[in-house]
Amino acid sequence: MTDNVLLEAKNVTIRFGGLTAVSNFNLSIRGHELVGLIGPNGAGKTTIFNMLTGVYKPTEGEIRIGGEPTTEMKPYQITARGVARTFQNIRLFKELTVLDNVKIGGHIHYQYSGLAAVLHTNRFYEAEQRAESEALGLLEIFGLRSRANALAKNLPYGDQRRLEIARALAARPKLLLLDEPAAGLNTGETLALMDKIHESRDKFQVAVLLIEHNMELVMGICERIIVLSFGKTIAEGRPEQIRANPTVIEAYLGEPAEAAGL
């Protein structure tokens, strides 16, 4: 493994009872890549995300972060090593403010004792000030600073999507996993999101692995695409290669490329 490999999955398989959800999956993420993971519903995409983040443990194979096996790691330990994610179904702290949601995302970098918090020590105040400053900076990037004190539940749906990405970036990840970030967004919101993903990748020097059904977004921003069908990888390559791959069109789309937006 070379030094710039952030995450690697080797021959990863997971079974639930008699069902093989993912079979012999391989993945290597380097540097500041922007990689798409696509396939029909039930292909195993979110299951892969759950394995990469420690929610599920592979039945076979191995996942490494920075060369270190994740077999014994808890999800929070994987986050601490630089992997953050969003979810297909938005998971915000709806009763907290927009600002507090982002601050929570970065809490692993602002550790202080419970006693320090109770006594309001200088260390506590300094950590809180840094957390707020960084959180406000992220909200500025995602156009949410003016809503910092609003409750997360009161944001429009598209803003909640952006807030979830901002919260994930607060963890200062080396690799950001986005699970259907454009789900439920209209065309204008999707195009704006594409710009923000690119901007975030460049500004924070973070690699991005995203699951998405919106082919315009995937083909427009991903440098490499992996295609799954029934838990198996059926193709991998650049967008133009995937767009022209008849196996992908048949297995994933089941319709002519033009009709599918490819």
Residue spans for each PLM region:
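Glycine-rich phosphate-binding loops of nucleotide-dependent enzymes
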Residues: 2-262
